[in-house]
Amino acid sequence: MAGPLFTANRAIVSAQGARLQLTAAHLAQEGIEHVRAMRDNEYLAKYEAALTDNAIVASTAGWEAFVALVSPCSVSEVCTLDPFLPMGVAANDSASLKICSLPCTTRLYLESGIYRGTGTESTKTSFTRTIEVEPVSETEEHVVSTVSWSFHGVTHSVVISDYLMPWQ
């Protein structure tokens, strides 16, 4: 009798672990996509402000604005993400990327089915998410999104990275 119950228990634990890993992968990818959207918004803002068809000028200006914007999310200080706040970087909860000194242990909250950077104690999850933007060259940034969580006393993490370059 104990054998089937043990097997059923292990199957449930495995399913829970898989669900958490899938959620973490989606949260990590959301971090990458948010930084990419920030780059795109800077380009579009510079393009519209220039009132010109010169896409190269807008691309350069947009890239420089993007690099300056995300520079606080570097190796020594990463950022956390709350995608429901206005797009930007700040040291407080006024922008989507919040500067967080290492080790950054800011938890995500699940409110109404949405993962956020703020919430109540009853909605705190075991997930943490950090965004790091490392300059590779003048025209390339390496974006790393890391989501970590604890399950049955073991810490797990999903790391997704991408390289962003200026619009051409």
Model-predicted regions and their roles:
Residues H26-Q168:
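Low-complexity, Gly/Pro-rich coil/beta segments used as flexible assembly/activation regions
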Residues M1-Q29, M38:
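Aliphatic-rich helix starts adjacent to a transmembrane/signal segment
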